[in-house]
Curated annotation (Swiss-Prot):
Region (Disordered), start-end ranges: 542-581
Species annotation: Arabidopsis thaliana (Mouse-ear cress)
Higher taxonomy: Eukaryota, Viridiplantae, Streptophyta, Embryophyta, Tracheophyta
Gene: SEC3B
Ranges of Acidic residues composition bias in the record: 555-569
Known function: Component of the exocyst complex involved in the docking of exocytic vesicles with fusion sites on the plasma membrane during regulated or polarized secretion. Involved in polarized cell growth and organ morphogenesis. During cytokinesis, involved in cell plate initiation, cell plate maturation and formation of new primary cell wall.
UniProt key word Coiled coil: yes
Protein name (Swiss-Prot/TrEMBL): Exocyst complex component SEC3B
Length: 887
């Protein structure tokens, strides 16, 4: 018989090399063929074919316990064994030999930890049954020794396996050395060499008992089939004997049955008695249960009653109105000494009302009659207190103002300007600031009448203060009046033009410095005191006004901190689009309405004294207007805006009147020389520049634009009245405009633009006037020149001498008449230029322009003659230039 692969040492070494590093030792390795039990689709036939594999059993000791693993090895492309799969034998649950294989060499191993039990396990086919038995015996021995249990074995008799193991355990002869070094042969079974795994399936004692049993039947250990037949026959004989014995015991059975029937009757009687007792017990249990239910209900009712009493005590305590608070709310005094008690009563009332509302009170209590009655009582208390407090505050606001009116020293008087001081008034109002907050919480609608009463009273005071202050301010300001129209022809206006009227704008600035911060402070105080939900205000008067800030500091004011902002923190965080903003603006209109008339009176008074002071007042107003950013300063912004509009309107009226005076010059009789309104405009512009403050530059630039536009238009109209002298009038006036405004044009961009425009118009007028003078003295010369130039567009220069009137003879006649006595002609040209010129200072520059223009024209004529009449002699340009230079 061929040698088994289990004895192949090379195969074992190859397996050990494949698992090197795992600290496991190979117990057995054997070649097998792997296949599947169920054929798949025809396209996957290759997967069902048998594949060569090697099964290797390995063990690893972990202290007192061991781990056994079944490894599946496959051959790589190079013929080297490599691990394919690994099964832990502790999960081996079934060993089944396939009965469909006649050879009995195919088996499967079932493991209970496979993820998919629906997939058929692989089938392993051995070369012969000896290899199969050898592998299975080794697996079973390892399971019994290492795991302490055996898997289920199907398809093979385990006794046959044990007998085969006993017959096929080979004896291996080993040698050991004695003490004297000589080897001694020793017989050892293969099972002894396979440490711990080759134990027998049947113990020695069991085998001896089996031999004794077989010896009784005179059957050898190998005659198992005969022994099995013998046992079957004896079993049948025993069963027949049992049936016979049963038939012989019939009388005994009848006796037993009678006894059983008697016992049954007794049991029935006992069952009847037990049923009766059971009914009685059930009734007793029901009675006990009913009693327990009643007791539980009584106990629960007692607990509920106790809890209800506690809750009712709490509700009663919540509904109780303290007598001291009730007295304060219904009939208490509102004097300053009693305000703390009134505030405490308000706080208690607000808290009590909130406590009776559904979010703070259980909805079940909300419908109780006592709660409804108590809520009605609290509402009545609230209405009474709000009515009393409102009446008191209305009278109190009026009394504060009446007290001020009764003291005449409080207002400005003749010879004494009195700065309004509302510190004591605000201090007295602060006493009731917290009361106002609580009134808002109790009934917001009551604030409307209170606000109107406060506005009405304080409006009278503010208007009286502003009226008296403005009146005394105008009376105490001593300054002579400047003309309202600067561009008239009267001499008196120019004499008064240099009068210092700065006191006028200073008076207006003082009016704003005193009253604008006051109005802003009053607006801020009113917004906070009357509980408007608007953002916090900027510092009074806005930024960028040092005088204003100093004035506030002199008053000793602390910016009207009411000391009430900690009552309701929610009021400190309103949005920019607060719904109270519209109501605040309406109330501020009532508070400050009418005071603008006194500001208008100061503006009108200042305008009558010096219209140009409108520029300074406009800048001052704009500076104050840019500083008012707070929402509560809305009316102050409107007031400043109206003042700015009024000042702009009055200044525009002044500009219109001045422009009208300029236009009146158009209707005068023929005018020569520099028109009077040009130097007057220069003086006016110089004065206007001195008055510019802050943002009034745009206002002045607009006036400049209107002035100069009318000035230039009027100048052109006057010049057109006498076309003969139009250019002289234009050049003299445009030159005067440049001379007068040279310094201002260097610093004022708007005037610089008009300066350039005047310069361009001056150059054009000079060119026209000089050309007229030159043509007047040398008309034939330049007329001949013009004819030649006109013909050169149609014919060649060589043909021109043959044209009528342009022959060489005509040229000579023309030169003789024009250039003989040319010095006299030039002198006449100078006299004509000098004759009608009123501004002598312009003569040198005009004469230089005239000489240059004449030389340019004469040089062009000489070049033209040289081209058309090359043989003719004409006086040269150099000769003419020397002649002009000598004169």
């Amino acid at each position: 018989m061929a040698k088994s692969s289990a004895d192949d040492e090379e195969l074992r070494r190859a397996c050990e090399a494949a698992i090197e590093g795992t600290k496991q030792s190979i117990v057995m390795s054997i070649r097998v063929a792997k296949s599947r039990g169920v054929w798949g689709k025809s396209g996957k036939l290759g997967r069902q074919m048998a594949k060569p594999r090697v099964l290797a059993l390995s063990v690893k000791s972990k202290g007192p316990r061991k781990k056994a693993i079944l490894r599946v090895m496959k051959y790589s492309s190079g013929g080297v064994l490599e691990p394919a799969k690994m099964y832990d034998l502790k999960h081996l649950s079934k060993v089944e030999v396939i009965t469909s294989d006649p050879s009995g060499c195919t088996f499967t191993l079932g493991f209970d930890n496979l993820r998919s039990q629906s997939v058929a396990p692989p089938q392993w086919t051995m070369r012969n049954t000896d290899d199969r038995n050898r592998l299975l015996v080794c697996i079973l021995n390892i399971c019994k020794d290492v795991l302490g249990r055996l898997p289920k074995v199907v398809g093979i008799d385990i006794v046959e396996m044990a007998l085969w193991a006993k017959d096929n355990t080979p004896v291996v002869t080993t040698q050991r050395s004695t003490e004297d070094g000589e080897p001694v042969a020793e017989s050892v079974t293969e099972s002894a060499l396979k440490v711990t795994v080759e134990k027998e399936l049947v113990s020695q004692a069991e085998e001896e008992d089996m031999e004794a049993l077989l010896g009784t039947y005179v059957i050898g250990i190998g005659e198992a089939e005969a022994f099995s037949e013998r046992l079957k026959r004896e079993l049948q004989a025993l069963e027949a004997a049992n049936v016979h014995a049963i038939l012989e015991s019939e009388p005994l059975v009848d006796e037993v049955l009678n006894g059983l029937e008697a016992a049954t009757n007794i049991v029935d009687d006992m069952d009847e008695w037990l049923g009766i007792f059971n009914i009685k017990l059930r009734h007793m249990r029901e009675d006990i249960e009913s009693i327990e239910i009643r007791n539980n209900k009584l106990e629960m009712q007692s607990v509920n009653n106790k809890a209800l009493i506690e809750e009712l005590d709490k509700v009663i305590e919540r509904l109780r109105v303290p007598s001291e608070y009730a007295a304060s709310l219904t009939g208490g005094s509102f004097d300053e000494a009693d305000m703390l008690q009134n505030i405490e009563a308000c706080e208690w009332l607000a808290k009590a009302l909130r406590g009776l509302e559904v979010p703070n009170l259980d909805p079940i209590y909300a419908n109780m009659r006592a709660v409804k009655e108590k809520r009605a009582e609290l509402e009545k208390l609230k209405a009474t207190f709000v009515r009393r407090a409102s009446e008191f505050l209305r009278d109190y606001f009026a009394s504060l103002v009446d007290f001020k009116f009764s003291d005449k020293s409080y207002f400005s008087q003749r010879g004494q300007l009195k700065r309004p001081d509302h510190a004591d008034l605000r201090y007295k109002c602060r006493t009731y600031a917290r009361l106002m907050q609580h009134l808002k919480g109790l009934n917001k609608n009551c604030l409307g009448p209170l606000r109107k009463a406060y506005c009405s009273s304080l409006n009278l005071l503010l208007r009286r203060e502003a009226r008296e202050f403005a009146k005394e301010l105008r009376a105490s300001t001593k300054v002579s009046r400047n003309p309202t129209v600067w561009l008239e022809g009267s001499t008196g206006s120019s004499q008064n033009a240099n009068t210092d009227t700065s006191a006028v704008s200073d008076a207006y600035a003082k009016m704003l410095t005193i009253f604008i911060p006051l109005l802003v402070d009053e607006s801020s105080f009113f917004a906070h005191f009357m509980c408007f939900e608007v953002p916090a205000l900027a510092p009074p008067g806005g930024a960028g006004n040092d005088k204003k800030s100093q004035s506030n500091n002199d008053d000793g004011n602390d910016n009207d901190d009411l000391g009430i902002m900690d009552i309701d923190e929610a009021d400190k965080k309103p949005g920019k689009n607060s719904p109270d903003l519209t109501a605040l603006n309406e109330s501020l209109q009532d508070l400050l309405d009418g005071i603008q008339e006194d500001f208008y009176a100061v503006v009108d008074w200042a305008y009558k004294i010096d219209p140009l002071r409108s520029i300074s007042m406009h800048g001052i107003t704009e500076r104050y207007l840019s500083g008012q950013k707070a929402d509560a300063a809305g009316f102050v912004r409107l007031l400043l805006g109206d003042l700015e509009s009024r000042i702009s309107m009055q200044f525009s009226h002044f500009v219109d009147e001045a422009c009208h005076q300029i236009e009146k010059n158009e209707r005068n009789v023929r005018q020569m020389g520099v028109l009077p309104y040009i130097p007057r405009f220069a003086a006016l512009a110089t004065r206007m520049e001195q008055y510019i403050q802050g943002q009034s530059r745009n206002l002045v630039d607009q006036a400049y634009t209107k002035f100069v536009s009318i000035l230039f238009v009027t100048l052109e109209k006057i010049a057109q009245q006498d076309p003969k002298y139009a250019d002289i009038l234009l050049l003299e006036n445009y030159a005067a405009f440049q001379t007068c405004l040279f310094d201002l044009a260097n610093v004022v961009p708007t005037l610089a633009k008009f300066y350039d425009q005047a310069m361009e118009a001056y150059e054009q007028a000079c060119t026209r006037h000089i050309s007229m003078i030159i043509y007047y003295q040398f008309e034939r010369l330049f007329l001949f020149d013009k004819k030649i130039k006109d013909l050169m567009y149609t014919i060649t220069p060589e043909e021109i001498p043959f044209q009528l009137g342009l022959s060489k003879v005509e040229l000579r006649k023309m030169l003789k008449s024009s250039l003989s006595g040319v010095d006299k002609s030039i002198a006449a040209m100078y006299k004509k230029l000098q004759k009608n010129l009123a501004s002598e200072e312009l003569l040198p520059s005009l004469w230089d322009k005239c000489k240059k223009e004449f030389l340019d024209k004469y040089e062009s004529f000489v070049q033209l003659v040289a081209k058309v009449y090359p043989s003719e002699n004409v006086p040269g340009v150099t000769e003419m230039r020397g002649l002009l230079a000598s004169m």
